[in-house]
């Protein structure tokens, strides 16, 4: 069985915003990846950005500078 660890999960209102986040993070070599929204979270488009919890400040700053609108930021076991 795979062990779950606490992750930072950023949800988006639209798939377009989620894909923009993926593109921006790849360009800037930022950590994380797109995942389906975990069951315990009910949110927007069904896609979320998943990264280590310690990256929250850097990722929120990156989204702000990149003009990406997120829905919510969660910490949950993934």
Predicted regions and their residues:
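A short linear hydrophobic-aromatic micro-motif
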Residues: 31-37, 71-72
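Short proline/glycine- and acidic-rich turn/helix-capping motifs at secondary-structure junctions
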Residues: 39-45, 75-78
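Short glycine-/aliphatic-rich beta-strand segments at the starts of folded cytosolic domains
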Residues: 2-11
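Small/polar loops that bind or transfer phosphate-bearing groups
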Residues: 10-13, 51
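Short connector loops at helix/strand junctions that flank enzyme active sites
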Residues: 5, 27, 42-44, 68
């Amino acid at each position: 069985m795979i062990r779950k660890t606490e992750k930072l999960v950023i949800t988006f209102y639209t798939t377009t915003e989620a894909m923009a986040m993926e593109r921006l993070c790849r360009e800037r070599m930022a950590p994380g990846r797109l995942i389906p929204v975990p069951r315990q979270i009910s949110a927007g488009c069904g896609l979320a950005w998943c990264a280590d919890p310690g990256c929250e400040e850097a990722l929120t700053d990156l989204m702000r500078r990149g003009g990406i609108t997120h829905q919510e930021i969660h910490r949950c076991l993934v």
